[in-house]
Amino acid sequence: MRKPLLLFLPKRMMVLALPLMLSLCSYAATVTSQLSVNMKTDKACYVPGQTVTFVAEGNIPSSAKVRYRYGSHVLLVQDFSEVAKSKQWTWLPPSADYQGYLVELYTEGSGVENILGTIAVDVSSNWKRFPRYGFVADFDNYSSTVDKNANIKSEMAYLNRLHINGVQFQDWQWMHHRPVKLNGDGSLTQWYTDISNRWVGVEYVKNYIATQHAYGMKSIFYNLCFGAWKDAANDGVKSQWALMKKDGNGNYYQDYHGLPSSWASNIYLQVPGNGDWQQYMVERNKEVYGNFDFDGFQIDQLGYRGTVYDANHQKVDLPSGYGSFIDAMKQAHPEKSLIMNAVSGYGTEQIVNKNVDFCYNEVWGNGNGYGGAPEDQFANLYDIIATNDRLSDHLHPTVFAAYINYDKADNGGSGDHMLTREYFPAAPLAMSDELKTALVRYYDFLTAYQNWLRGVSSKAAYSAHVSVNGNTVKAWPPQANSIVTFAKTVGNSDVVHFLNFSNTSDLSWRDLNGTRQKPTRKDNLAVTIQTNRKVSKLWVASPDTHAGAVQELSFEQMGNQLTFTLPSLEYWTMVVMEGESQVYLTGEAVKKDGYGAYDLSQAIPLNKASGGNVYKTTVYLKGNELFKFTDGRDWGYCKSYCSEYENYQFNSHIQLAHLSTFGNDYKFCVPESGYYDITINLDSMRIVVKKADPMAIEGVTADVAANKDHAPWYSLAGDRAPNPHKGIYVKKGRKVVFK
């Protein structure tokens, strides 16, 4: 009974002092915004190779440009007037799978970029990589008093604008044990009532599905894994399948979920792991898929039920039954998606397996009656994500069904409704226009930066060391009256999220009565971050500012201290520090004397060959001294690429070593001093080290000014030359002739 609230949170940091270095980024344009243009796409998501069609609505200056970004990287800039006809145009994204992009409409002048509007694009061949889950729960035209098909069109257009790529159909079915109502001749009954006696029109269920498919969304039907109505025996449900409980007098009775007396029935529970019950539901699902074009099954449960028994009065392990039920449903329809609700985490270990598309948790507060740990704090959400991530072997993202304004829902409302209760069809709260706009901004942000937000597992998290002048800063988990940071490593970048808890002591994600005050916006914050990598670019983005557009920032890096000015922090601002992408050769073997090349000023960078992930250098190595390869993107961590063997020795007979990036800090050596050609191929995962011909080393003519670089010089004989003047010397594998 659910809808998505997504957070991804992690933990680790080692800081080693880098050599003294000062780095300033290039000048970046000032970014402002006048968000007067609404942008739309024709689909919620795209498979690689599909063309995106855009529509822009609003007053667009003739000088406007369209920019397509992957993170901060600009893929393409076009003049809007040249590409758009009637404010409509197309774009073919790169062919890479599972990528998010941000498309910006803007003007520029005098060093200022003015953002007019933005929209995200998701290119993913399977929705389960980056799920954005919505729901529908009303399938009635109320005796023709509403134009339901028009409502479907507008509702799905809004979900499309949010890039929702999967939609759950709540309480669409007839009976839980007979979801499809058929006439005597096997045809569909066009109208029926659900368990709460609401009318359901088959026409509208099918129209929702067709409209969603046109937008590239998945349509997922909801049902319990073990529910049946009263008198289900008339439909073939056997008493031997019943899930039993025992009262205080030792009497057994069938477990049930009680519902209001005005409803059609209570829900009577079956043993989910019973093979005959599973086969019964497989047959019912054949009727579902045979009559409706659903893409999968949202499986529900009811959380912890206490001690339960089967019809033979043997104890039943419900979580094991859930896992068995999932496997049976997948075996029967392997092409269909499966998602199962882990209510308050109950049964997570058995539910989170290879047969579900992603993890789905209905979360509550303390004392919710479903068992499990407290889950009403932001920190609890991270714990759930980390648990799901670990149990799924880092394969599955997490979707939350989180009822934020649960008690405020008693006050009523109308219009497009929020998910406030576990009974999805209830519509007590309407979304304000302000909230609708904010959701567009946040879903654009979630989609455009999905590779930075959800592109790596919780293993990538670390605790960042951050200070903000004049403010209290705490690393995750949240603490009262503080700016809270959460950090993770993504590729060659460190990503630090700034979360504004500075004017609240309430650290719960639940705002039961909708009374929590907004955070106080902070501007132009002086920030210092300790970083263990050499930063090449710094940029920020926020769903609260400039519709999520990238702002590149100037910064200074002195040693391991990175300083910059954060433009603003309202709720959430993401800071991305792009690290230098380089493979280095380090160790005692690359220095004739001293302590070995273990900092960036002394290490030898390998040159990246054109195309692929191949790095090469020719360098003088001292025999029987250790060297290793390290990734400049994570210099401070200082773990090398490693081979199958510790202290592996390259010689004339063995020149290859398998390459990985995990495990111990392996080092290598060569048997004799001399020049060596070194190649690291990160595609084939191989290291090649072989003797080089010194006279074949590339020659470069230079003047003495070339000596200002800090890398060491050597004579052709391999001796260290601290101050070369005239003659031929070797540096970084290149022969240099000084005149």
Language-model segment annotations:
Residues 693-717:
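Residue-level detector of functionally pivotal "anchor" positions at catalytic/ligand-binding pockets or at interdomain
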Residues 126-131, 137-148, 221, 225-292:
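Active-site-adjacent "subsite" loops/lids of carbohydrate-active enzymes
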Residues 558-580, 676-686:
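C-terminal beta-strand-rich structural cap/linker in extracellular carbohydrate-active enzymes
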Residues 155-203, 227-246, 258-277, 304-312:
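Aromatic-lined carbohydrate-binding/catalytic grooves of carbohydrate-active enzymes
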Residues 580-623, 632-659:
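Aromatic-rich carbohydrate-binding modules that target alpha-glucans
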Residues 116-175:
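An acidic-aromatic substrate-binding cleft motif
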